[in-house]
UniProtKB/Swiss-Prot annotation:
The keyword Transport applies. GO terms for cellular component: plasma membrane. It is a peripheral membrane protein. It is an enzyme of class 7 (translocase). This is Phosphonates import ATP-binding protein PhnC. Residues 4-248 form the ABC transporter domain. It is found in: Cell membrane. It comes from Staphylococcus saprophyticus subsp. saprophyticus (strain ATCC 15305 / DSM 20229 / NCIMB 8711 / NCTC 7292 / S-41). Keywords: ATP-binding, Cell membrane, Membrane, Nucleotide-binding, Phosphonate transport, Translocase, Transport. Its EC number is 7.3.2.2. ATP binds at residues 37-44. CDD domains: ABC_PhnC_transporter. Part of the ABC transporter complex PhnCDE involved in phosphonates import. Responsible for energy coupling to the transport system.
Length: 257
């Protein structure tokens, strides 16, 4: 049984635009899967359908054999708790401390009133500190989030996802706003988390060379259709040309080794 299964998934927006067109796809536990494609190809729609930030129109998505599509109430909350999310714009509470932002990864485990009052148990605080240590910013735990650099803020969001103790982490263009050196540091963090903790990483990336360097598997979308799915070794220039419908351009290469 695959960890994530897309079964004939279709997403049609209210304006009639087809975001996903009959996607059939299996993602295995421990994959570092990179989704690539031009802007508007369906990358974010595919990623965000996994935890139902976007609901699909037809088909079904299964997580560990359970239907995410049909889940509701407590079952949906429990399934989402197992899926961490990292955003391009970090999605932090800027005026809150680093520690408080990371602890927000624990909200799915406790009653809302306790979280509003900041009543996190000692065990959660230990998990938060361990998550910060794993991404090398433990020394910033008392700082306000808006005092930190973009790269540090993205590391906070990774630590927040880790604090959930997820089996899957979704990352939607997490390095799009970062400089090349910081990009590599963040990608190294994600790769290490994948390898050391066995957490499945599914990530949207714009840069071809990053996809090849860090991914174990490449998933290519064009106009909402799955046009490539295979190990990174098969992701040749010709394969990317097929995914993009044109040659790779210089701005699609980060150029950092």
């Amino acid at each position: 049984m695959s960890q994530i299964e897309f079964k004939d998934v279709r997403k049609v927006y209210s304006n009639g635009h087809v975001g996903l067109d009959r996607i059939n796809l299996n993602i295995e536990k421990g994959d570092f899967a990179v989704i690539v494609g031009l802007s508007g190809s369906g990358k974010s729609t595919l990623l965000r359908s996994i935890n139902r930030l976007h609901d699909i129109t037809e088909g079904e998505i299964l997580i560990d054999g359970k239907s995410m599509t049909k889940a509701s109430g407590n079952q949906l909350l429990e399934m989402r708790r197992n899926i961490g999310m990292i955003f391009q714009n970090f999605n932090l509470v800027k005026r809150s401390s680093v520690m408080r932002n990371v602890l927000s990864g624990r909200v799915g485990y406790h009653p809302t009133w306790k979280m509003v009052l900041g009543l996190f148990p000692k065990e959660d605080k230990i998990k938060a500190l361990e998550a910060l240590d794993r991404v090398n910013i433990l020394d910033k735990y008392k700082s306000r989030s808006d005092e930190l650099s973009g790269g540090q803020q993205q590391r906070i969001s990774i630590a927040r996802a880790l604090c959930q103790e997820p089996a899957i982490i979704l990352a939607d263009e997490p390095v799009a706003s970062l400089d090349p050196l910081t990009t590599k540091q963040v990608m190294d963090d994600l790769k290490r988390i994948n390898q050391e903790l066995g957490i499945t990483i599914i990530i949207n990336l714009h840069f071809v060379d990053l996809a090849r360097e860090y991914g174990t598997r490449i998933i290519g979308l064009r106009d909402g259709q799955l046009v490539f799915d295979g190990p990174v070794e098969r992701a040749t220039d010709e394969a990317f040309n097929e995914i993009y419908g044109r040659s790779i351009q210089d701005e699609e290469k980060l150029g950092v080794n």
